[in-house]
């Protein structure tokens, strides 16, 4: 919804980054779209609304149509958000008893969204965060809803890398973590990402 109104009002509401570095430029969505010949554009719903497909429209379709105006050949993808931490107030306030219940609603909503805009796929970040807990991680959030700065962000990075490149996520040399990630956590992250992507290590 926020991005929809930013388009209508042509708001320069975004910090433009290039290869992860700030340019200190404030830009609008049109400027971002026109800044390169993007081959992929991802969409996601804000986490608290993500389980409820009714909140996606009419904004999602309008945003997709707007992007198509400037990038007629780009592929669309939905970036699946994740469930809140078990036992947290945020989970309770969202109306769910368990993270699994919230994730099931997220999956359904994202599939409906992908179908609605003709997306080429869904980046399974929510599935990865949940699977990591099953694979032995005790904590994947830093504040019950954002990904943890070490393991969580690394896991999500592996999911994106594997999803878009099709390459193995086993031996990734990245080491510039905000919070240390142990060798065991690296192994869990790689195994988890491979599992949700349906690939082998």
State where each predicted segment sits.
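Surface-exposed cleft-lining segments at the edges of enzyme active sites
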Residues: 45-54, 85-99
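A short helix->loop->beta-strand "cap" motif at the edges of active sites that frequently abuts
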Residues: 65-76, 119
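Generic structural signal for well-ordered alpha-helices
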Residues: 29-30, 60-64, 107, 111
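Solvent-exposed loop/turn segments at secondary-structure junctions
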Residues: 1, 46-51, 81-86, 127-131
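Conserved SGNH/GDSL esterase-like catalytic core that processes O-acyl groups on lipids
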Residues: 1-57
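Catalytic His-Asp segment of secreted/periplasmic serine-dependent ester chemistry enzymes
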Residues: 94-201
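Extracellular/periplasmic catalytic domains that process cell-envelope and extracellular macromolecules
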Residues: 33-37, 70, 115-116, 154-155
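Structural recognition of the beta-strand scaffold that forms the well-ordered cores
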Residues: 39-45, 75-80, 121-124
């Amino acid at each position: 919804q926020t991005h929809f109104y930013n388009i209508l009002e042509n708001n320069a509401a975004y910090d433009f980054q290039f290869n992860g570095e700030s340019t200190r430029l404030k830009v609008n969505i049109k400027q971002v779209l026109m800044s390169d010949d993007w081959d992929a554009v991802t969409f996601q719903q804000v986490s608290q609304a993500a389980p409820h497909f009714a909140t996606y429209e009419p904004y999602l379709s309008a945003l997709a149509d707007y992007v198509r105006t400037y990038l007629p050949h780009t592929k669309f993808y939905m970036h699946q958000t994740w469930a809140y931490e078990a036992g947290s107030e945020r989970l309770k306030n969202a109306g769910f008893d368990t993270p699994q219940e919230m994730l099931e609603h997220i999956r359904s909503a994202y599939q409906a969204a992908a179908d609605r805009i003709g997306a080429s796929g869904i980046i399974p970040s929510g599935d990865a965060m949940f699977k990591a807990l099953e694979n032995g991680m005790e904590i994947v959030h830093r504040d019950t809803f954002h990904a943890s700065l070490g393991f969580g962000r690394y896991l999500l990075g592996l999911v994106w890398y594997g999803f878009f490149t099709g390459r193995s996520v086993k031996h990734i040399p990245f080491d510039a973590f905000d919070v240390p990630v142990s060798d065991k956590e690296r192994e869990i992250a790689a195994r988890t990402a491979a599992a949700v992507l349906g690939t082998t290590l």
